[in-house]
UniProtKB/Swiss-Prot annotation:
Class I viral fusion protein. Under the current model, the protein has at least 3 conformational states: pre-fusion native state, pre-hairpin intermediate state, and post-fusion hairpin state. During viral and plasma cell membrane fusion, the heptad repeat (HR) regions assume a trimer-of-hairpins structure, positioning the fusion peptide in close proximity to the C-terminal region of the ectodomain. The formation of this structure appears to drive apposition and subsequent fusion of viral and plasma cell membranes. Residues 522-553 are cytoplasmic. Its main location: virion. It comes from Newcastle disease virus (strain Italien/45) (NDV). Belongs to the paramyxoviruses fusion glycoprotein family. A lipid is attached at C523 (S-palmitoyl cysteine). It is a single-pass type I membrane protein; Single-pass membrane protein. Residues 1-31 form the signal peptide. GO terms for cellular component: host cell plasma membrane; membrane; viral envelope; virion membrane. This is Fusion glycoprotein F0. The lineage of its organism: Viruses, Riboviria, Orthornavirae, Negarnaviricota, Haploviricotina. It is found in: Virion membrane; Host cell membrane. Keywords: Cleavage on pair of basic residues, Coiled coil, Disulfide bond, Fusion of virus membrane with host cell membrane, Fusion of virus membrane with host membrane, Glycoprotein, Host cell membrane, Host membrane, Lipoprotein, Membrane, Palmitate, Signal, Transmembrane, Transmembrane helix, Viral envelope protein, Viral penetration into host cytoplasm, Virion, Virus entry into host cell.
Length: 553
């Protein structure tokens, strides 16, 4: 059988072409235009990039807590180092014991292993209650057991080195970096200097620095007395332990400098202690860092609402707090799966909800389609700063301008006032003085009024009031009904008795019978009359014919 030539495009190339065609059909994302919405009490406060992440990258940082002194200065630093060593052991022994109990719980197989595992967790938690997060942390600790054992196998060489930071790769299944914040101090102060220091000064310097580091360790592990092995360490705590050397590990894990500051603020970089050795004062921490994917065509837009003035009172716009826009599609974004930073939104999944046509039209700039709720009270903050200018409801608060002096009044029916440096340089609101530097250009809509049909009831108190009005209307209707019943009761009861009703029915039937008979009789008489008319007409015609015949003769 002859083979046919194939013209199929390879799968990777097909995917690239499909992606390119898809992107070419999607218009580049532009943030929501807040200029037509500001005067309606809807303020766009900012945008954030939307990223997808998964916590898949792990590495280990080995903290060398006890520094190695130069040989010629060991005697001078012996006393503070011994005191520091004893304090370290006292502080971190509960942590090491907790880690060992959990890791040793996997030595038994089957159901007994599961019971020992849960028992070890509960034994490490105050009040005997283990949360799901603590059980997850314990599972991660079990998985890192082999890596911790490999690190302990190298503990002597790690403790003996004078390097402040170096990679440890011998026999380890994941990236590990040994760091020593105190070793860095010793290297900077004593190893790399030609200055001669007396023994007393060396003792003082080492003692002060060790005490400061102990304070940081107490700050890191102090809140973990109840469950020291199951509480994740924050990125701030990790930096306290490792100093600036922490950046080396994060860079090795693939965290770029452009993402580092944002990820630090997100709290997604965490660490869990996996080992502590009191002999060499080695502390092992497993670092979890997210793997981040950028969604270049998506951003989150944050919206805030002001209490605006309407003819029905104060009200606020019914719009989502966060929306996302891709091309011409605008949908509400659920941020419950996301971690926020100043510039980014890191999400494990993207969940959006479609908006009603009215809200979509409202956010697109058609303020007459916006709906408002009478749920804002008089104590709600009636102003908001936006790019050096102020949007304020000057009917709820006094907008006092100090430069030039005067009171800014809000026109009747106007929802809010847009105040910039052209109308006031220094503005006072509720005792707060603001110097304005921004401006609302001609693209901002002003003097927007909210119609009565745009204000609806959504608050519990307002709904209760409306229900009260409905109840009053029902009560009035019941009163009218009772009044009607009382008037009916005054009528003659005999007229409405059963015998009277029977009499009425009989008379009605008789009347109908007489009516039918009369109709039949009338029809008969009309028929008879027409028959007589036909007879007379026939006789008349015959007589006329006879007379015509006689005349001809």
């Amino acid at each position: 059988m002859r083979s046919r030539s194939s013209t199929r495009i390879p799968v990777p190339l097909m995917l690239i072409i499909r992606i390119a065609l898809t992107l070419s059909c999607i218009r580049l994302t532009s943030s929501l235009d807040g200029r037509p919405l500001a005067a309606a009490g809807i303020v766009v406060t900012g945008d954030k990039a939307v990223d997808i992440y998964t916590s898949s990258q792990t590495g280990s940082i080995i903290v060398k807590l006890l520094p190695n002194m130069p040989k010629d200065k060991e005697a001078c630093a012996k006393a503070p180092l011994e005191a520091y060593n004893r304090t370290l052991t006292t502080l971190l022994t509960p942590l090491g014991d907790s880690i060992r109990r959990i890791q040793e719980s996997v030595t038994t197989s089957g159901g007994r292993r599961q019971r020992r595992f849960i028992g070890a967790i509960i034994g490490s938690v105050a009040l005997g209650v283990a949360t799901p997060a603590q059980i997850t942390a314990a599972s991660a600790l079990i998985q890192a057991n082999q890596n911790a054992a490999n690190i302990l196998r190298l503990k002597e060489s790690i403790a003996a080195t004078n390097e402040a930071v170096h990679e440890v790769t011998d026999g380890l299944s994941q990236l590990a970096v040994a760091v020593g914040k105190m070793q860095q101090f010793v290297n900077d102060q004593f190893n790399n200097t030609a200055q001669q220091l007396d023994c007393i000064k060396i003792t003082q310097q080492v003692g002060v620095e060790l005490n400061l580091y102990l304070t940081e360790l107490t700050t890191v592990f102090g809140p973990q007395i109840t469950s020291p092995a199951l509480t994740p360490l924050t990125i701030q705590a990790l930096y306290n332990l490792a100093g600036g050397n922490m950046d080396y590990l994060l860079t090795k894990l693939g965290v770029g400098n452009n993402q580092l500051s944002s990820l630090i603020g997100s709290g997604l970089i965490t660490g869990n202690p996996i080992l502590y050795d009191s002999q060499t004062q080695i502390l092992g921490i497993q670092i979890t860092s997210p793997s981040v994917g950028n969604l270049n065509n998506m951003r989150a837009t944050y919206l805030e609402t002001l209490s605006v003035s309407t003819t029905k009172g104060f009200a606020s716009a019914l719009v989502p707090k966060v929306v996302t826009q891709v091309g011409s599609v605008i949908e509400e974004l659920d941020t419950s799966y996301c971690m926020e930073t100043d510039l980014d939104l890191y999400c494990t999944r993207i969940v959006t909800f479609p908006m009603s046509p009215g809200i979509y039209s409202c956010l697109s700039g058609n303020t007459s389609a916006c709906m408002y709720s009478k749920t804002e009270g008089a104590l709600t903050t009636p102003y908001m700063a936006l790019k050096g200018s102020v949007i304020a409801n000057c009917k709820m608060t006094t907008c006092r301008c100090a430069d030039p002096p005067g009171i800014i009044s809000q026109n009747y029916g106007e929802a809010v006032s847009l105040i910039d440096r052209h109308s006031c340089n220094v503005l006072s609101l509720d005792g707060i003085t603001l110097r304005l530097s921004g401006e609302f250009d001609a693209t901002y809509q002003k003097n927007i009024s909210i119609l009565d049909s745009q204000v609806i009831v959504t608050g519990n108190l307002d709904i209760s009031t409306e229900l009260g009005n409905v109840n009053n209307s029902i009560s009035n209707a019941l009163n009218k009904l009772e009044e009607s019943n009382s008037k009916l009761d005054k009528l003659n009861v005999k007229l409405t008795s059963t015998s009277a009703l029977i009499t009425y029915i009989v008379l009605t039937v008789i009347s109908l019978v007489f009516g039918v008979l009369s109709l039949v009789l009338a029809c008969y008489l009309m028929y008879k009359q027409k028959a007589q008319q036909k007879t007379l007409l026939w006789l008349g015609n015959n007589t006329l014919d006879q007379m015509r015949a006689t005349t001809k003769i």
